[in-house]
Amino acid sequence: MTGIEQKTPVGGSETGGADGLYAVLPLRDIVVFPHMIVPLFVGREKSIRALEEVMGVDKQILLATQKNAADDDPAPDAIYEIGTIANVLQLLKLPDGTVKVLVEGTARAKISKFTDREDYHEAYAAALQEPEEDAVEIEALARSVVPDFENYVKLNKKISPEVVGAASQIDDYSKLADTVASHLAIKIPEKQEMLSVLSVRERLEKALSFMEAEISVLQVEKRIRSRVKRQMEKTQREYYLNEQMKAIQKELGDSEDGRDEVAEIEERITKTKLSKEAREKALAELKKLRSMSPMSAEATVVRNYLDWLLSIPWGKKSKVKQDLNFAQEVLDAEHFGLGKVKERIVEYLAVQARSTKIKGPILCLVGPPGVGKTSLARSIAKATGREYVRMSLGGVRDEAEIRGHRRTYIGSMPGKVIQSMKKAKKSNPLFLLDEIDKMGQDFRGDPSSAMLEVLDPEQNATFMDHYLEVEYDLSNVMFVTTANTMNIPVPLLDRMEIIRIAGYTEDEKLEIAKRHLLPKAIKDHALQPKEFSVTEDALRNVIRHYTREAGVRSLEREVMTLARKAVTEILKTKKKSVKITDKNLSDYLGVEKFRFGQIDGEDQVGVVTGLAWTEVGGELLTIEGVMMPGKGRMTVTGNLRDVMKESISAAASYVRSRAIDFGIEPPLFDKRDIHVHVPEGATPKDGPSAGIAMVTAIVSVLTGIPVRKDIAMTGEVTLRGRVLPIGGLKEKLLATLRGGIKKVLIPEENAKDLAEIPDNVKNNLEIVPVSRVGEVLKHALVRQPEPIEWTEQENPTAVPPVEDEAGASLAH
């Protein structure tokens, strides 16, 4: 092979002559700059031959980077035309056939033409000369490049720190620019571009620009790495400490599951849709729990608290059914009658279907025992698709029963409201508050006052239980309360929508017995319908002669008695079936307990049938009066309370003021004592609604005119003889019907209430509205008293005082 021609090596001011002929070593993924000493590993045959060729002559070779690193035998046009002339300092052949070579770049060169040589690449190239430039400007740039390069090397851990010391000692600015460029972490095309630039100033500017941009990125990377490292160290430290704690607890015999329980609670907190306040509270308690021994008493308290907090429903709602026809079917199937209540529920569902913003209604079902208040609430839950929970308030005296105990007390728990919500598992159940009128009050607080927050739609969205100490939303709950009387604190009563449920009529009871009570008795006693039957007449007789109530509880007990006796008879006598009729009814239930429709056989003087309202419905009230020789005293007995005593006084005063109109001689009041008795004596009685009955009894006694036996009456009387309205009309009319009385006198102002009375009640009674006592006496007495003429005496007699059982006087 011929020797390699070359130009005189170029420095800063050297100029090139004609092209020299050089062996070319194509480089992959590296650009060699002048003044750089670089080790290279050579494995391709052509490249090894090129090295062997130059080692035998002047050891100069042209290093040019190929454009595609994956090309094993690059064509001339696949090699960059700007390269570096380098001296081969050392060549070492390795056992695997590759060659390690140490080269030193001397000058830039531009390839003009490749030869046709086949065994290795060979090309003509001319060394490139750097232009003359302003030395002051270049020195200024160099002063900026060196400190930036130091900073860059500190941030980029891939570059050896010794390079910085070497770079700071370089006086040749061209060499400085090439040294910095060779160590920059830039792509091959960008490095090749730096190699192609002859101007030292431009090379320094490019290096400075790149380093400033890269330093910003490296600083961010450093911060990220530091943060990640700190986080990893913290995680590793916590893991290490937790493992140590587990090992210590295991040695001490503590539960191995203590930490697992904490992890489980943390997972539950993450999954539960807690309010912001509740989540902060839960995380704070969990943090405390982590620092405690699992076996400590305080840890148990915290665990119990977190369990309660996470067990109640947060945002979990049942889908409320809005099918009005379905709701009506459910209510009708499970309860007979009760039209007003059903109508109100269907109205609520209709509004709910249009607007989801409406608050749940708070209904209060008021009525006597056994009319189906509690079971109706269960049916409402079924009709609306809500979960059903019940809380009995009967006998509750402690406010903590509602709001819970504070956690400072040993064994503290949330109140019954939160406990019931946990049981419901949904945040919009139907919540039945049973017997709300039976709540008590003592030194521990007033639970009815605590209920004010629960039953106020404006407040219960932020209900605060003393145990939980976080607000809980009850605004989606549909509250239904039940009561026997309206004896409820006024603020609490004001928050509820009152729906009165009066007693059932005889026909309604008969239907309830046939549809519900009889099938239930057959099922509960494991009977077949063909084995046990009760005729309609028998059921009616049970209602009339064995029960006297507004509801159907006693009726249910009697039907159950029939079923029990039927089972006993079938098993004893091997009968195939038992049929109860009105003929054999007494064989199973014994003698009749109540009279029905058996009023007094004859009209009597001084005996009047009044009407009363009690907690268990309406009742007939017999009022008896007698007259005897005496000194004008009036005695009242029968366990009467103040209002009824005053009503008797008003009646007596009215009769005395109108004595001559009733045919009574005024001196008679001074010569006779009158005794009014209201059986039964053991039952307390109160209220003004027996006023007209008292007037009728006193007039009958003083005139001797009998009172009709088939008439009952109710109404308050004034001293002027007006009849005032009363309450509980439906219950009183039902009692009249049960008692077999056909005619009833009611105040005229109560006539408007007849619209709510069932038609079968109105059709079976002659209801007469009255406004004055004269009208009452016209209907009640067998004949009308005839007025008399009387001249006022000189010494008018005083109105006799009214005496109770003890003989104490009561002023009129």
Swiss-Prot record:
It is an enzyme of class 3 (hydrolase). Keywords: ATP-binding, Cytoplasm, Hydrolase, Nucleotide-binding, Protease, Serine protease, Stress response. GO terms for biological process: cellular response to heat; protein quality control for misfolded or incompletely synthesized proteins. The keyword Hydrolase applies. One of its GO terms (cellular component) is cytoplasm. It catalyses: Hydrolysis of proteins in presence of ATP. Its EC number is 3.4.21.53. Residues 602-783 form the Lon proteolytic domain. ATP binds at G367, P368, P369, G370, V371, G372, K373, T374. Pfam families: AAA, Lon_C, Lon_lid, LON_substr_bdg. Homohexamer. Organized in a ring with a central cavity. Belongs to the peptidase S16 family. This is Lon protease.
